[in-house]
Amino acid sequence: METNESTEGSRSRSRSLDIQPSSEGLGPTSEPFPSSDDSPRSALAAATAAAAAAASAAAATAAFTTAKAAALSTKTPAPCSEFMEPSSDPSLLGEPCAGPGFTHNIAHGSLGFEPVYVSCIAQDTCTTTDHSSNPGPVPGSSSGPVLGSSSGAGHGSGSGSGPGCGSVPGSGSGPGPGSGPGSGPGHGSGSHPGPASGPGPDTGPDSELSPCIPPGFRNLVADRVPNYTSWSQHCPWEPQKQPPWEFLQVLEPGARGLWKPPDIKGKLMVCYETLPRGQCLLYNWEEERATNHLDQVPSMQDGSESFFFRHGHRGLLTMQLKSPMPSSTTQKDSYQPPGNVYWPLRGKREAMLEMLLQHQICKEVQAEQEPTRKLFEVESVTHHDYRMELAQAGTPAPTKPHDYRQEQPETFWIQRAPQLPGVSNIRTLDTPFRKNCSFSTPVPLSLGKLLPYEPENYPYQLGEISSLPCPGGRLGGGGGRMTPF
């Protein structure tokens, strides 16, 4: 009967997990899960009472440990199967997340995966630190009664101050619990790690933290709370501190060389030199050099450079910085609102008709006031200035009666022949019209002849008759002389 109760108690205790605050052992251990069956609850209560009695008396503890070891030896894989598959107890799924069952609820529901509970973590012998010389509790070995699960005598799972994480077969150095109802406590450590089946139930009131529990499952409540102190180094949203600003001292635009920061940084250095505007053209800065005196900030009380030149360079744009802004700008002058917003009262046709009638009336009034001008001959400026009357066209009036049969016709050239230079002296009308050779005739030939322009007493002198006689005849009744050949 005691064996069956121990078996049922070990089953119910295998469903519970220990909730320890940390690996230092601060705080008491938690109570196991309450089971839904009445018989396991009574067995668990009996086991708890037996564990309390074992803490006060070493002999009772040894007997209780022997009974539990005998019960576990008959049914060893039960805790492993209970922990490897999800719980089918409806009372465990329906309980609120409070008290000792909080770890079990988290393991099966809240974390979103099926946990595999490990009772002993397999460690690599090469990377694991040697804990044999450490006086503290070493995983896998301790100095106390343990719950062994072996099929024969001489096979213990280790030793500890409480129930160890024993389902790992190993070779003990002392007599271990056998399959019989009674056996002594063995002192030894398992030398062969086996498959883990989960942490064993700890019923001692002052028991230490089980070394076989992984660090992630020791305190799930504390592990689920984010540690902002450790995350602050890796959080991308936390603003990082920027290095302090340093004042850059830059020389003239044409100067070369790298800038070296000053050694003294305690006092604020105000740069009064001209700040360059670029480094592209080092030797073509005539315009910048010409305006260097305008770029200098007088003192720090005037503010920064951008604040000092917020209205532009002093003297370039305006000489009166405090003068108000003009109300009229180029934009406003270009887009003035229309003066007369109303439509005109008359159209273009009416205005054009009125203009046409006005021109017609003006022409009529001028025609009435001014008389009509007569047509006049074309008169040049010279004729108008000298007022010379033109000769009338037509034949002159005859002075004497003429005989057109006997008289030589009087023409325009005969009348104007004496006026022409180089013409022979015409004394009478019968004198032939020839070239005057009086001045070129030799002297012997001209002896006895009349001199040029000498008057002759011929009856038919020029001016007395108006025509010449017919050739071969005489003129008049008196004798006359013939024209010499």
UniProtKB/Swiss-Prot annotation:
GO terms for cellular component: acrosomal vesicle; axonemal A tubule inner sheath; axonemal microtubule; cilium; cytoplasm; cytosol; male germ cell nucleus; membrane. It is found in: Cytoplasm; Nucleus; Cytoplasmic vesicle, Secretory vesicle, Acrosome; Cytoplasm, Cytoskeleton, Microtubule organizing center. InterPro entries: Sperm-assoc_Ag8. The keyword Calcium does not apply. The keyword Nucleus applies. Expressed in testis (germ cells), but not in liver, kidney, prostate and small intestine. Expressed in airway epithelial cells. Residues 379-393 are annotated as: Mn 2. Residues 132-150 have a biased composition (Low complexity). GO terms for biological process: cell differentiation; flagellated sperm motility; positive regulation of transcription by RNA polymerase II; single fertilization; spermatogenesis. One of its GO terms (molecular function) is microtubule binding. Keywords: Cell cycle, Cell projection, Cilium, Cytoplasm, Cytoplasmic vesicle, Cytoskeleton, Differentiation, Fertilization, Flagellum, Nucleus, Spermatogenesis. Residues 327-340 are annotated as: Mn 1. Residues 151-191 have a biased composition (Gly residues). Transmembrane segments: none annotated. Microtubule inner protein (MIP) part of the dynein-decorated doublet microtubules (DMTs) in cilia axoneme, which is required for motile cilia beating. Plays a role in spermatogenesis by enhancing the binding of CREM isoform tau to its coactivator FHL5 and increasing the FHL5-regulated transcriptional activation of CREM isoform tau. Involved in the acrosome reaction and in binding of sperm to the zona pellucida. Plays a role in regulation of the cell cycle by controlling progression through the G2/M phase, possibly by delaying the activation of CDK1 which is required for entry into mitosis. Belongs to the SPAG8 family. Microtubule inner protein component of sperm flagellar doublet microtubules. Interacts with FHL5 (via second LIM domain). Interacts with RANBP9. This is Sperm-associated antigen 8. It comes from Homo sapiens.
